[in-house]
Amino acid sequence: MPEFHLSFRVGQLSDAETIAALSVQVFLATYASDGVRPDLANEAFAEYSTRRFAERLTESARTFLLVEKGTGLLGFAEVRHEPSSAPVAGHSGSELVRLYVQPQAQMQGAGRALLAQSERLARTYGANALWLAAWEGNANALGFYAHLGYADVGRATYVIQGQSFGNRILLKRLGSP
């Protein structure tokens, strides 16, 4: 088996383009398994544009954690660490906005390491929980988070160009840093 050495760092404004490209790749691999429809293409190019990531990378309430192999980006986690209410009553904490890992780099420890770093970051900012929304059609993601201690606390809907996608709201209580 080839060696798979990973390095981790905090994202910077100069990473916006590679984060955007990886995001489009992962988004379409996840949602467009039956082909790329216009609604998904529009969402990919609007929500995951370099400009949108550049804006988010400069927000003080967000941190991007990157995982690389050499100089190539394999994945990232976007954490919003200001207090945030989950879209289900009674739950709040830091939000894991997204954790994206290239399909060919999955199941090699990158996602697990990014998630652990995201949890540490949330605790550093005083959060007692980390929550996220995962598409209910993504069995791999739901299994990944359940295996790592995330509880399903409810459901929310995300709308892409008039089409609704159900999301499971997952939450993990965090201990002290």
Task: Give the positions of each predicted feature.
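Active-site-proximal glycine-rich helix-loop-beta segment
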Residues: 149
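Conserved beta-strand-loop-alpha-helix junction that forms the acyl-donor binding cleft
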Residues: 132-142, 159-164
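Acetyl-CoA-dependent GNAT
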Residues: 3-6, 10-16, 20-34, 39-106, ...
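Canonical helix-turn-helix DNA-binding module
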Residues: 60, 142-143
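Hydrophobic beta-strand residues of extracellular immunoglobulin-like
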Residues: 63-66, 132, 168
